[in-house]
Regions:
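Short, Lys/Arg-enriched N-terminal segments with co-localized hydrophobic residues
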Residues: 2-14
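Non-catalytic cap/lid and distal C-terminal segments of serine-dependent acyl enzymes
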Residues: 14-266
Length: 266
């Protein structure tokens, strides 16, 4: 992977946006996020490696999602990671980093998910527990896929672009229970064929896409693809060409291509 470059576009000024900064009990610190939209299905956007919640807007992914946001089909919640203290801090204490990452997972599942559900229920006049689409590019795709496969009771869609799906990327050869349960290629490979989660996965839509050009690492997607196939887990795993690089212009194209399928009722 490489640091994503800034793409300058005209800023979308008509979209409803809301900014939040609140204390997280799971992390013991204040966390920031933004909400884009006025209704529709909830989408959780997780930024690229070491990215911030404002990257969804600053890198103009808002422009790409605008047709679905402004038409009330989706409401996007763009959050912060703590990658610099966890996956990216490869010289740091691995046991500490694995616990901190697990705390971040609980920040999402125990704090952000209820917040998102309450907001979209109020926006849409819904009741109940709407499922959430997890979306990310680069390391954000790794986090999104981990959330989707760990908690199919909370997430009912996945769009993972140019991701890595083994915790070895951030933790090397270190392994404990926390690293294991946050490494999809490890826990899915050992999942029993009759595990109830497999039925849940197969009622949902998961898209896992990678290019094969500069800075991409398609071997991670191929490894996950083999495991999903072996377990009978349905997912649309797509390999784009050798011209498709690990960069925003290609992610824009992939979002435009895949989102209609994710949102289509079938």
């Amino acid at each position: 992977m490489r640091p994503a470059r800034i793409i300058r576009r005209k800023k979308n000024i008509s979209m409803k946006t809301q900014y939040y900064k609140e204390y997280s009990p799971a992390l013991g610190r204040e966390m920031e996020w933004k909400v884009y939209g006025h209704g529709g299905r909830p989408v959780l956007y997780i930024p690229c490696q070491d990215g911030r919640f404002f990257d969804f807007e600053d890198f103009h992914m808002t422009d790409v999602w605008a047709p679905w946001i402004e038409s009330g089909q989706v409401c996007v919640f763009s959050i912060d990671t703590i990658d610099k203290e966890t996956w990216s801090d490869t010289w740091g204490n691995a046991e500490y980093r694995s616990q901190l990452y697990e705390n971040w997972i609980h920040y999402i599942t125990d704090e952000m998910v209820p917040f998102m559900r309450n907001m979209v229920n109020e926006m849409n006049g819904w009741t109940g527990y709407p499922g959430i689409i997890a979306f990310g590019c680069s390391l954000g795709a790794a986090h999104a896929a981990n959330l989707y496969f760990r908690r199919p009771d909370l997430f009912d869609g996945l769009l993972a672009l140019s991701g890595v799906y083994s915790a070895e990327y951030g933790f090397g050869t270190f392994m404990n229970d926390l690293v294991y349960q946050n490494s999809p290629v490890h826990y899915l490979a050992n999942m029993p064929y009759d595990h109830p989660y497999i039925q849940l996965y197969n009622k949902k839509k998961a898209i896992i896409c990678t290019g094969q050009g500069p800075w991409e690492q398609p071997e991670y997607t191929r490894q996950l693809d083999r495991i999903l196939h072996a377990k009978g887990i349905n997912a649309w795993v797509d390999y784009w060409g050798y011209d498709c690089s690990h960069d925003w212009p290609w992610w824009y194209k992939q979002v435009t291509y895949f989102v209609p399928y994710l949102l289509r009722d079938e």
